[in-house]
A protein has these predicted regions:
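Short active-site-adjacent structural elements
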Residues: 149-151, 170-180, 196-200
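Active-site/ligand-binding loops adjacent to catalytic centers
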Residues: 10-21, 25, 78-165, 180, ...
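Short, small-residue-biased leader/transition segments that mark boundaries at the very start
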Residues: 1-7
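Short glycine/serine/threonine-rich phosphate/pyrophosphate-binding segments
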Residues: 64-74, 98, 166-174, 198
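Short beta-strand segments
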Residues: 30-32, 63-65, 90-92, 188-192
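Active-site/ligand-binding-proximal alpha/beta "capping" segment
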Residues: 23-68, 73, 77, 130-134, ...
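Nucleotide donor/acceptor-binding cores
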Residues: 184-186
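Short, well-ordered alpha-helices that flank and scaffold nucleotide-derived cofactor binding pockets
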Residues: 51, 76, 80, 175-179
């Protein structure tokens, strides 16, 4: 596609911005702190969820954060349109600090666990996308990798959906939120990734064993572990 690949040995966090500054015709999109991200979800995702749940009602929304734009923008819209009635929660993987931040009423940021098999979600800070709306978040749930990997296989078996671990985490979180809100609760979440990008890991027996996750998958679903 005509792209130039730049390999850097130093910390990667600021490399794209620094590289763009050296070029006359480059734009650094600043994914995590470009608040057009959050705004897009206020204008599109939030209204779409609200419209699709108009007949059934909506009690809760929950998802994990990477940039924070999806959670923040959708939460902002749903809180405004419902008069604050829709509960909005954050789902957090191991290794992220946001669960403790919410649970301690914004007093501490401490990592829960050492890391996760999920990719692109979880944070070590408040992004510019999330910061304006963090006080609208009503609660948070820590979702362990064992539950996420089991949901990957369950959705493939029961629904024919080939989802990634981040989507699986969101589904686990939505189910737990619904249980906590009570019988008949309507909860929305985001299915944000497919398994194709991760299939050489998620469906590899060796990889699952290396992460101590094989036992988390029900034995009748092991038939989907098709790679050595």
């Amino acid at each position: 596609m005509g792209s130039e690949m730049c390999i850097r040995d130093r910390n990667y966090n600021h490399q794209a911005a620094r590289h763009a500054e050296k070029l006359d015709n480059a734009v650094w999109t600043n994914q995590f702190d470009n608040v057009a991200n959050r705004e897009a979800h206020i204008l599109t995702t939030g209204p779409e969820i609200w419209a699709q749940t108009r007949q059934t009602g909506l009690d809760g929304f929950i998802c994990a954060t990477g940039t924070g734009g999806t959670l923040a923008g959708t939460t902002r819209y749903l809180k405004d349109v419902s008069g604050g009635q829709v509960q909005c929660w954050l789902a957090d993987p191991p290794g992220s600090v946001l669960h403790t931040y919410v649970q301690t009423k914004r007093e501490r940021m401490e990592r829960t666990g050492n890391g996760s098999i999920t990719e692109g979600i979880g944070q070590g800070r408040l992004t510019s996308n999330l910061q304006p709306d963090i006080d609208l978040i009503d609660n948070s749930l820590h979702i362990e990798d064992e539950a996420s990997i089991a949901m990957v296989f369950r959705m493939l078996d029961e629904e024919g959906l080939y989802i990634g671990a981040s989507s699986a985490l969101n589904l686990v979180a939505a189910a737990r939120m619904a249980q906590k809100l009570g019988r008949g609760s309507k909860v929305a979440t985001i299915i944000c990734d497919g398994a194709a990008r991760y299939q050489t890991r998620l469906f590899s027996r060796k990889w699952l064993e290396s992460k101590s996750l094989l036992s988390a998958i029900p034995s009748h679903l092991h038939r989907y572990i098709v790679l050595p």
